UniProtKB/Swiss-Prot annotation:
Binds 1 zinc ion per subunit. It is found in: Cytoplasm. L-isoleucyl-5'-AMP binds at residue 592. It comes from Ralstonia pickettii (strain 12J). The lineage of its organism: Bacteria, Pseudomonadati, Pseudomonadota, Betaproteobacteria, Burkholderiales. Keywords: Aminoacyl-tRNA synthetase, ATP-binding, Cytoplasm, Ligase, Metal-binding, Nucleotide-binding, Protein biosynthesis, Zinc. It catalyses: tRNA(Ile) + L-isoleucine + ATP = L-isoleucyl-tRNA(Ile) + AMP + diphosphate. Its EC number is 6.1.1.5. CDD domains: Anticodon_Ia_Ile_BEm (cd07960), IleRS_core (cd00818). IleRS has two distinct active sites: one for aminoacylation and one for editing. The misactivated valine is translocated from the active site to the editing site, which sterically excludes the correctly activated isoleucine. The single editing site contains two valyl binding pockets, one specific for each substrate (Val-AMP or Val-tRNA(Ile)). A motif ('HIGH' region) lies at residues 66-76. A motif ('KMSKS' region) lies at residues 633-637. This is Isoleucine--tRNA ligase.
Length: 959
């Protein structure tokens, strides 16, 4: 029958097989989904799935913990849904797919919340207690929202980095890497946020545009004889005029701390005579610099930077205050460039990594490094001229003093990309502080490879999805500085060291003491370190040592979850001894946003490399960020954010899930109201297809009605062969964590293969043949296998809908309770499947051409439905033979009342002729047939319908 209005059986004395199903047309997702969530919670579905997979090989997706603060945003939803789809897709293969969700609980954002609620100045122990309570409340809210999205996991026992066992094991991990020789203390410039009052991890730094003062500053000549020798000029030439070596900087606030100048050894530098005096700049920058300073000049001499090594120049503020009466030597550095500026870099070792490395390479002791900027961004009161001022406020004042000194050549505003704290969105600096580090290039005590070498080798042994992630992470590890492990915070796991008050050395029994502290933390949390009296562990030595007050970087918290979760708190579920084999890994997959190449992926790799000498994961999957329909980043200030809770309440979580699954996560994920409307339309097509399948299986019992494949009609064999071929593609996509091709192919299958062809052809047979006929049962056999396969394909992403349909479909089977304890369904593949696929592809091409002709006739008003038409097809040999094999069933495939087939002349094209039928319409099947009224007892029926209702039934062979 055509896909137009169906006859209503109750009004006809000639009924058709129109069945109903409890699976409704409308999903009513916002109302029904919470009921499913409640049902899954009540029946402990995750545990039930795990029990069904007992003894199977485990698949471990280790959860990168979200931070326990604030409401979920759409990025959280993307991440958790992707993880859920991976777990479900793997579980349906029969693996024991384990997912223990977790939360990152320590750190500055929660400290800030406690400060907002209770004010500053609370005792540390009280801050920790209140932070713990706050995080617990935040976790409860987020957990409910994650479950609402249909995400299955061990929500009853998630891992929390603030659980006592996890905190204790983190201290133990610190002890391990200390024993191995990776940890050291030193003065180094680190990313420093004034608002946090602490060092920042690399992953806590973001870049934003900022306008600063850019200045060109002259350092007056001091070592005339050395300069004369370098440039091969007479000393009298240099004494005849004032002279400067000129630097360019965008950080005027660092000038008071200048201690050296950096030149490239191989760049040529020019001595230039100008009306203002003698100047030294890179030869290639002379023209640009003179133009900028509105000077004319002549190059007197040149020399390579190497010739100026060690030459000294006066500090530009020396004339303004005796506190700056010092000279700055030239040090050579390969990092100096001549793209901008003067080709000379001023070096303040306390405030730049390369500056620091350069000065340390020239044996500058820590005690001589000038470091007047305090942790809050204010100069120490002892700094001449600028003491007590905030560095940003001091910038213009420094410029004025330099101008007054006669050493300023230029000052103007300069827009550039600059480091900011990701939490406070405020500018940060490099600041030399005494910190604890994990050394990237330190030789460990066992004499094996350095941390950098081990981590880079681990990257090569890791699978990346998408593949470009490998090079990205490689570059980050290859170029990163030592890891600053210490933080100056309160709500964090302590670096529980006892440090000698005079020498700063660690207690010689530190590994043993760390274990004793860990045992206390395991009983009562990190608060135990605050209340611990050193005498309890050190006895009479206590007066010689003090407790280290630093806490561990929160990236060490989450970066060691492979140690304190997989091997620790949740080892019973997550740990497999095979992970300890040389090629073994603790987790099959880590899955996070692309920012985690410098975050969790990064810290986890470093900690595992130190602890085990290899990565903790077999594979890394990276997804992009969410943007709006115009490609803009989600931002509250723009007003383009979309809350997942609102979508779930308005459209259903299933729509979010389908959106995530249908989007290529390797790039940006665009979302908008318009995009979601299209997702809803796609969902309806899938749901309507399911409803049709389930309705037409209402009176089908596979145990009673299954037929051997050789008894199926040919088109049914084709449909199942097509389903099997598609399943192979679907599973191959799932195997490499690809979801959007699965959705695209499922939608094509529903709309084109099923709705646009097979089901359209099938309706006549399903509705009009005898209920228990082979023709109808053959169709139902095919529908049964198609439905079962299809429900499993969609279960990873359309979890609510698949489960709802499964309750209808699988009633009375061993897996009635849930689809998720079953596995992907392998339908019986008919013999000669590949030949069937090829043959029916040709038949469908012909049908497509016939449909075009029918549509043209319909537009002309000559027919209404396609059943009002009769068609003649003239085809070449191979196509003719394929069509001829269908016999009279060809008309059912073309959905016309009659179909005639002719053989085209050799080499002739496909020719289709369509004409309106001149016959009467059968009341029951709506076909226009010459035999309507052949039986006077049933004048409105065709012969086929009288046979199906009152006789032995029609015979079908192909369709």
């Amino acid at each position: 029958m055509s896909d137009s209005k169906k006859p209503t059986p109750e009004k006809s004395k000639y009924p058709v097989n129109l069945l109903d199903t409890p699976f409704p047309m409308r999903g009513d997702l916002p109302k029904r989904e919470p009921l499913w969530v409640k049902q899954w919670q009540d029946k402990q579905l995750y545990k039930k799935i795990r029990a069904a997979r007992k003894g199977a090989k485990k698949f471990i997706l280790h959860d990168g913990p979200p931070y326990a603060n604030g409401d979920l945003h759409i990025g959280h939803a993307v991440n958790k849904i992707l993880k859920d789809m991976v777990i479900k897709a793997r579980g349906l293969t029969g693996l024991d797919a384990v997912y223990v969700p977790g939360w990152d609980c320590h750190g500055m954002p929660i400290e800030i919340q406690i400060e907002k609620q209770f004010g500053k100045g609370l005792p540390v122990k009280e801050v920790q207690e209140k932070a713990r309570a706050y995080a617990t409340g935040q976790i409860a809210r987020q957990k409910a929202d994650f479950e609402r999205l249909g995400v299955l996991g061990d929500w009853a026992d998630p891992y929390l980095t603030m659980n006592f066992r996890n905190e204790a094991d983190e201290v133990r991990a610190l002890g391990k890497i200390l024993e191995k020789g990776y940890v050291f203390r030193g003065l180094k410039p680190v990313n420093w946020c004034f608002d946090c009052g602490s060092a920042l991890a690399e992953a806590e730094v973001e870049y934003a545009d900022r306008t600063d003062l850019s200045i060109d500053v002259g350092f007056p000549f001091a070592d005339i004889d050395a300069l004369a020798s370098a440039f091969h000029v007479g000393a009298d030439v240099l004494k005849a005029k004032p002279g400067w070596i000129v630097i360019w900087t965008t950080t005027p606030w660092t000038i008071p701390s200048n201690q050296a100048l950096n030149l490239h050894p191989e760049i040529e530098y020019a001595l230039v005579d100008t009306s203002r005096g003698l100047l030294i700049v890179a030869k290639e920058r002379v023209e640009a610099c003179l133009q900028s300073w509105k000077l004319e000049g002549t190059v007197l001499a040149t020399c390579e930077g190497a010739a100026l090594n060690g030459v000294r120049f006066h500090h530009p503020l020396a004339k303004m205050d005796a506190g700056y009466d010092r000279t700055s030597p030239v040090y050579l550095g390969d990092y100096v460039t001549i793209d901008t500026g003067t080709g000379i870099v001023h070096s303040a070792p306390a405030y730049g990594v390369e500056d620091f490395q350069s000065c340390k390479a020239h044996n500058m002791p820590d005690s001589e490094i000038i470091n007047p900027v305090m942790g809050n961004g204010v100069y120490a009161s002892t700094l001449p001229l600028f003491g007590g001022q905030m560095i940003w406020d001091a910038n213009p004042k420094i410029v004025e003093v330099l101008r007054e000194s006669g050493n300023l050549f230029d000052a103007h505003k300069y827009a550039h990309s600059y480091m900011h704290c990701w939490r406070h969105k405020t500018p940060i600096i490099y600041r030399a502080t005494s910190q604890w580090f994990a050394g990237m290039d330190v030789q460990p005590n066992d004499g094996n490879a350095t941390l950098r070498e081990t981590a880079l080798a681990g990257i090569d042994a890791t699978a990346f999805y998408p593949s470009w992630g490998k090079q990205r992470l490689h570059n980050m590890i290859a170029n990163r500085p030592d890891w600053t492990l210490s933080r100056q915070r309160q709500w964090g796991v302590p670096m529980a060291f006892f440090v000698h008050k005079e020498t700063g050395a660690l207690h010689p029994r530190t590994p043993e003491l760390l274990e004793q502290v860990a045992q206390r933390i395991e009983k009562s949390g990190i608060e135990a370190w605050q209340t611990l009296d050193p005498r309890e562990l050190l006895g009479d030595e206590a007066d010689m040592y003090e407790k280290n007050r630093d806490t561990l970087d929160v990236w060490f918290d989450s970066g060691t979850t492979h140690w304190h979760v997989i091997r620790g708190s949740h080892a019973a579920d997550l740990y497999d001894a095979s992970a300890d084999l040389p090629d073994g890994r603790l987790a099959d997959l880590y899955l996070e946003g692309s920012d985690q190449h410098r975050g969790w992926f990064h810290s986890s790799l470093l900690t595992a490399s130190m602890l085990y000498g290899k990565p903790p994961y077999k594979g890394l999957l990276t997804h992009g960020f969410t943007v709006d329909g115009e490609g803009r980043k989600m931002s509250k200030s723009i007003g383009n954010t979309i809350a997942p809770q609102e979508i779930a309440n308005k459209m259903g979580a299933e729509i979010i899930r389908l959106w995530v699954a249908s989007t290529d996560y390797s790039g940006e994920l665009a979302i908008s109201d318009e995009i979601l409307k299209r997702v809803v339309e796609g969902y309806r097509r899938i749901r309507n297809t399911l409803r049709f399948l389930l309705a037409n299986l209402t009176d089908y019992d596979h145990a009673k009605h299954a037929l051997p494949t050789e008894q199926w009609l040919e088109i049914d064999r084709y449909a199942v062969a097509l389903t099997d071929a598609l399943q192979k593609e679907v599973l191959s996509h799932y195997d490499v964590y690809e979801f959007h091709p699965v959705v695209a192919k499922l939608q094509t299958f529903c709309s084109e293969d099923l709705g646009g062809f097979y089901l359209d052809v099938l309706k006549d047979r399903l509705y009009t043949t005898a209920p228990d006929s082979v023709a109808r049962r053959s169709a139902q056999n095919a529908l049964y296998h198609i439905t079962q396969a299809m429900l499993h394909w969609m279960a990873p992403f359309l979890s609510f809908t698949a489960e709802e349909a499964w309750q209808v479909f699988a009633h009375g089977t061993e897996h009635t309770d849930t689809i998720f304890t079953s596995t992907y369904y392998n339908a019986p593949v008919p013999q000669g499947a590949s030949a069937l696929l090829e043959k029916w592809a040709a038949i469908r091409n012909v049908r497509g051409e016939v449909t075009k002709q029918l549509e043209a006739l319909r537009i002309d008003g000559k027919i209404g439905s396609s059943l009002q038409a009769e068609v003649t097809v003239s085809a070449g040999e191979s196509v003719h033979d394929a069509l001829a094999s269908l016999g009279d069933d060809l008309r059912f495939v073309l959905i016309t009342s009659a179909a005639k087939l002719e053989r085209a002349p050799e080499g002739g094209d496909l020719l289709i002729t369509v004409v309106p039928s001149t016959h009467s319409k059968c009341e029951r099947c709506w076909h226009y047939r010459a035999d309507v009224g052949h039986d006077h007892a049933h004048p409105t029926l065709c012969k086929r319908c009288t046979d199906n209702l009152f006789g032995s039934g029609e015979q079908r062979s192909a369709a």
